[in-house]
Amino acid sequence: MLTAVCGSLGSQHTEAPHASPPRLDLQPLQTYQGHTSPEAGDYPSPLQPGELQSLPLGPEVDFSQGYELPGASSRVTCEDLESDSPLAPGPFSKLLQPDMSHHYESWFRPTHPGAEDGSWWDLHPGTSWMDLPHTQGALTSPGHPGALQAGLGGYVGDHQLCAPPPHPHAHHLLPAAGGQHLLGPPDGAKALEVAAPESQGLDSSLDGAARPKGSRRSVPRSSGQTVCRCPNCLEAERLGAPCGPDGGKKKHLHNCHIPGCGKAYAKTSHLKAHLRWHSGDRPFVCNWLFCGKRFTRSDELQRHLQTHTGTKKFPCAVCSRVFMRSDHLAKHMKTHEGAKEEAAGAASGEGKAGGAVEPPGGKGKREAEGSVAPSN
């Protein structure tokens, strides 16, 4: 068919060398529809709209007469068509991508051919993104191996976020001198270093809680702690006597300010518990199931909890009784000591009674009563 067309064109060229071609009814080319993969979309034509209208590709082209391209300096002959090879530039090369060497080659080509011996990622000093080789097909579609790279080429990556391993070309990724590096100590480490002396001070204050009982109050009371406002403390503060109202070494007592009470305690905690008894406040609640009883003092709550658990760890060495609290056992031991004193006093009283002189006439009276004979 190509030979017949060439023959007809050659005969027309010899007969009418200066015949003008008829006006062609041209239609603009449609956009290229990719058929290599179902995921491929519409891709625009590489030609401009003006060039599309100037191409002689209409459906009613008559090859019986010679024709020439608008704007071309020479006519197109059969020899020109035959001489156009897939690799030689010709009038149809405008329809192809500049990088394409064949008419039916894919519209997308890999921009960087992959190396077989390269790693799965490669850093280039002149680029701003990591170029993925095409040997790994996990991130590229089979129909368009370079589609992903064409989309990633316009982005500007942050190399500090990528954090690649040491690379001979990765020296440009390091920040300039004076900048903050990701591998440097964060601000949180500095905050921890600042907070270290505070934690040491807290540990030293906690160690003070484990000191002996006599050395706890060697340090004067700080301003943040509450001061007892009982009448005795107020009087001592007014007189300026630290040990007591009389200024001696007598133990200072904290008395109740309620009129008519007058109870005094050696510890402020005991006075506060006593004042809660006056006010009716019971802040200590039993959390046992279905109990919910409230108490004024914490030791009362602990004693109540032992009734739930049934634990009694203070047995009496004299009798078989067991107590929940040591003070209860000490009070119980006093009963045993009192019983011993009573027994000792009773024994001494019996001894005194045995050595005493009997009243006169007593023995004779018994003998008289015993010697009386029964009457008939």
Swiss-Prot record:
One of its GO terms (biological process) is regulation of odontogenesis. Gene3D superfamilies: Classic Zinc Finger. Changing residue 273 to M: In AI1K; requires 2 nucleotide substitutions. A motif (9aaTAD) lies at residues 118-126. One of its GO terms (molecular function) is zinc ion binding. Keywords: Amelogenesis imperfecta, Disease variant, DNA-binding, Metal-binding, Nucleus, Repeat, Transcription, Transcription regulation, Zinc, Zinc-finger. Changing residue 273 to K: In AI1K; decreased binding to the AMBN promoter; requires 2 nucleotide substitutions. A zinc finger (C2H2-type) spans 254-278, 284-308, 314-336. Ubiquitous. Residues 173-186 have a biased composition (Low complexity). It is found in: Nucleus. SMART domains: ZnF_C2H2. Residues 1-70, 167-223, 333-376 are annotated as: Disordered. It comes from the Eukaryota. Residues 333-343 have a biased composition (Basic and acidic residues). Promotes cell proliferation. Plays a role in tooth germ growth. Plays a role in the control of enamel mineralization. Binds the AMBN promoter. It is linked to Amelogenesis imperfecta 1K: A form of amelogenesis imperfecta, a disorder characterized by defective enamel formation. The enamel may be hypoplastic, hypomineralized or both, and affected teeth may be discoloured, sensitive or prone to disintegration. AI1K is an autosomal dominant form characterized by hypoplastic enamel in all teeth. Belongs to the Sp1 C2H2-type zinc-finger protein family. This is Transcription factor Sp6. The lineage of its organism: Eukaryota, Metazoa, Chordata, Craniata, Vertebrata.
